[in-house]
């Protein structure tokens, strides 16, 4: 019984000392950060869903032809108020990749939160998934460099000036 009390006490102590950020962050929050000003804008799932909707129907290396629905990156950036030359996209699993702004302009990539009408879950590419129109631009985009930019489980994007 004494061992149980010590384990309980230690558990409570470690829980109390855990980082506060873990308690503030909610799966589905998306933070856009500006590297230059260090300002940030966080979209909740609810505020993200109020932005203009965009769709891309395409295959990916991991999915058959699928209708992805979300918000164009142009609209996400406009709503955040940040501009730059590169987007550093970060995922929940700490994967990150840099996406040149010319991709946003040339291919109208989207930040999807639905797949075939169903909200993306973390175990299924969610909460957000960067999607390029691969089928519409097959000759240009069906290359490993672009596959590496199809980031799922996106939780933050840093707008960079370089």
Cite the ranges covered by each PLM segment.
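Bacterial N-terminal signal peptides
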Residues: 8-16
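N-terminal intrinsically disordered, low-complexity segments enriched in P/E/S/T
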Residues: 22-162
